[in-house]
């Protein structure tokens, strides 16, 4: 198991499909905060609970100026069915082919199982990873770490952040 990318690292750009006909690139969000939520699989109980929680907290993410993107190695059709079933209002990106290439670039791929790690990244407006966290695969990491990181980013913009800035949670 490799280490996920640490804060202070430039977030690797990528282009992945949201639907069979629509692709989305991280670079499209230049100048905005982005949350990347890598997860092992649509339909698994923990992943379903995690994505449903993020859907409920989505207004808080957006109020803090952040867009949420979910990423797994599932195909676009699986994502569409999962998003429809869970009534998700954020994009699920398919890291399907080459399998797990984006997860690998972020150090968030479980080679032994062929799925993404349960890993979170908060990326700042300049495309730099501000906060990253890998959760045990069977544990929903919740949203508090993401919200705290976004609040810390806002505090730094206002001159109230800590001197260390970016942080990483293993």
Language-model-detected regions and their locations in the chain:
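Chalcogenol-based redox active-site neighborhoods
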Residues: 1-170
């Amino acid at each position: 198991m490799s280490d996920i990318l640490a804060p202070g690292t430039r977030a690797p750009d990528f282009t992945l499909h949201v639907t069979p006909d629509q692709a989305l690139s991280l670079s499209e969000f230049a100048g905005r905060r982005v949350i990347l939520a890598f997860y092992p699989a649509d339909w698994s109980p923990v992943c379903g609970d995690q994505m449903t929680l993020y859907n409920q907290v989505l207004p808080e993410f957006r109020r803090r100026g952040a867009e949420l993107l979910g990423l797994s190695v599932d195909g676009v059709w699986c994502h569409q069915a999962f998003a429809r079933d869970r009534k998700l209002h954020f994009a699920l990106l398919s890291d399907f082919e080459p399998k797990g290439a984006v997860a690998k670039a972020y150090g968030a791929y479980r080679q032994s199982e062929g799925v993404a790690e349960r890993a979170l990244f908060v990326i700042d407006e300049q495309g730099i990873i501000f906060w990253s966290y890998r959760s045990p695969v069977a544990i929903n990491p919740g949203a508090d770490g993401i919200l705290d990181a976004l609040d810390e980013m806002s505090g730094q913009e206002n001159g109230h952040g800590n001197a260390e800035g970016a942080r990483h949670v293993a």
